[in-house]
Design a protein with these regions (language model features):
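Localized chelating/binding microdomains
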Residues: 27-34, 134-138, 165-168
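Non-catalytic DNA-recognition/assembly elements of restriction-modification systems
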Residues: 16-42, 66
Length: 194
């Protein structure tokens, strides 16, 4: 997605393909620069009232990776259970950071929470959440090649925050995010037809 040019030891990051109205370098950043990183948690499972008649979304790795927008989850929480979690606002970007599904991602379509296998970015006002989702999806294979090999792959919250990325200014982020979202929607529509 990017071209690296080394001119007197200066690395310049610009995309190979770009909307014509944008120019200039992309800024080097870390995932933590996109917003606040939140690791999920699990309400006590021994207390059935945390889950009984649940209406609140609570994502686990099984809920991520097939579609971008998280509109339902396999496990739902009651109001009591939800109050015991770290809540995420609509638009947060969710990424599995432990286990065989590491790197699977999704985006919150409404306020929700996750279990501890997921790190989420509550995207700040200086960044576009759609762009952040696609930037992480694009870079994750590179991240996987750099993590330590172990029986259960894991990226801790602190390591996740430090993963490198590149970003343009907000207006370009928004245009890229909208464009890629539109492509995803068209692909999904075509898949339904087929």
């Amino acid at each position: 997605m990017t071209t690296k040019i080394n001119n007197e030891h200066k690395k310049v990051y610009v995309p190979n393909l770009r909307f014509p109205e944008f120019q200039g370098e992309w800024e080097k950043c870390k995932l933590g620069d996109y917003g606040k990183v939140v690791t999920g948690n699990t309400p006590p499972t021994k207390d059935i009232e945390n889950y009984e008649n649940g209406t609140y979304l609570w994502a686990s790795p099984a809920d991520l990776g097939t579609i971008k927008s998280i509109t339902e989850t396999k496990t739902m929480l009651s109001a009591q259970g939800f109050s015991k979690t770290r809540t995420l606002p609509k638009g947060s970007v969710l990424v599995t950071c432990i286990g065989s599904t590491i790197g699977k991602a999704g985006m919150a379509t409404k306020e929700m929470s996750t279990n501890q296998q997921i790190n989420s970015i509550v995207v700040n006002d200086n960044n576009d959440n759609e762009f952040v989702y696609y930037a992480i999806q694009s870079a994750f294979p590179r991240y996987l090649s750099s993590i330590a090999v172990q029986a259960v792959p894991i990226i801790s919250k602190s390591a996740f925050e430090l993963l490198p990325n590149n970003r343009p200014y907000l207006q370009e982020q928004k245009k890229i995010g909208r464009f890629l979202s539109m492509l995803d929607e068209r692909i999904a529509t075509q898949n339904k037809i087929i």
